[in-house]
Amino acid sequence: MAARVLRARGAAWAGGLLQRAAPCSLLPRLRTWTSSSNRSREDSWLKSLFVRKVDPRKDAHSNLLAKKETSNLYKLQFHNVKPECLEAYNKICQEVLPKIHEDKHYPCTLVGTWNTWYGEQDQAVHLWRYEGGYPALTEVMNKLRENKEFLEFRKARSDMLLSRKNQLLLEFSFWNEPVPRSGPNIYELRSYQLRPGTMIEWGNYWARAIRFRQDGNEAVGGFFSQIGQLYMVHHLWAYRDLQTREDIRNAAWHKHGWEELVYYTVPLIQEMESRIMIPLKTSPLQ
């Protein structure tokens, strides 16, 4: 319809010109001009339908989405362990990591430590919080370089690993801060690779969506990456067992408004992954 309207207008305008000018001199040029003009207008109209407009932002999303009252920084570690070494790896982690957590000279807290049950096998996941942001992280790293027990632990650990990676994260302002909880629980870490430029939209939608997922106290924490793999979001949930997880997730679909928020957040995702994790005995999150 729009294309036919544009062509009709172009033809009428061109016809008026032809009546006032010599047909031999103007006709070829007018045909070329009206054809290219119509195509460009039609292309512009079509682009307006399919190209999503992104509003300009006046601040970094880390400032817009993170908690203002704290300067906490989180480190998420993924360690892929040799299958035959997992038991020994867990043993040395449970001996050394709690000592760092309990030492008041280290401005950091071990939030949780797990083995992946479903997902990447023979994997350990550790979540640390640094009270004071990047300066606290630097202070801890410098002190650990002088900690002989930790250096021995790191050397022994390196012989047990196949690979490892980490990310530095900030917490969403609308999520609970992770606090120790009693068990037994299983934990789900849902990780989302977002499309670049969509973090603000994700935060806006989930600021409303989180209220649908707090009835069972299952929401542990929500984070977004600052260093490492960027535009990554991690949601951490706690459930009594897998059946409880299934029941809680199904119940959300019966709450008015949940399906609409899911509808709008799904297009923001490039890739997603779910890990079901079991806490180690020394994990503050049980």
From Swiss-Prot:
Expression by tissue: Widely expressed. Most abundant in heart and skeletal muscle.
InterPro entries: Dimeric_a/b-barrel, NIPSNAP, NipSnap_domain
Domain of life: Eukaryota
Transit peptide: 1-23
GO biological process, one term: mitochondrion organization
Keyword Ribosomal protein carried by entry: no
Keyword entries, A-Z: Autophagy, Mitochondrion, Transit peptide
Record flagged with keyword Mitochondrion: yes
GO cellular component: mitochondrial matrix; mitochondrial outer membrane; mitochondrion
Cell compartments where the protein resides: Mitochondrion matrix
Bilayer-crossing regions: none
Any one Gene Ontology molecular-function term assigned to this protein's record: protein-macromolecule adaptor activity
Pfam families: NIPSNAP
Entry function: Protein involved in mitophagy by facilitating recruitment of the autophagy machinery required for clearance of damaged mitochondria. Accumulates on the mitochondria surface in response to mitochondrial depolarization and acts as a 'eat me' signal by recruiting proteins involved in selective autophagy, such as autophagy receptors (CALCOCO2/NDP52, NBR1, SQSTM1/p62, TAX1BP1 and WDFY3/ALFY) and ATG8 family proteins (MAP1LC3A, MAP1LC3B, MAP1LC3C, GABARAP, GABARAPL1 and GABARAPL2).
Family to which the UniProt record says this protein belongs: Belongs to the NipSnap family.
Quaternary organization: Interacts with CALCOCO2/NDP52, NBR1, SQSTM1/p62, TAX1BP1 and WDFY3/ALFY. Interacts with ATG8 family proteins (MAP1LC3A, MAP1LC3B, MAP1LC3C, GABARAP, GABARAPL1 and GABARAPL2). Interacts with VDAC1.
Record-given protein name: Protein NipSnap homolog 2
Organism the protein comes from: Homo sapiens
UniProt lineage: Eukaryota, Metazoa, Chordata, Craniata, Vertebrata
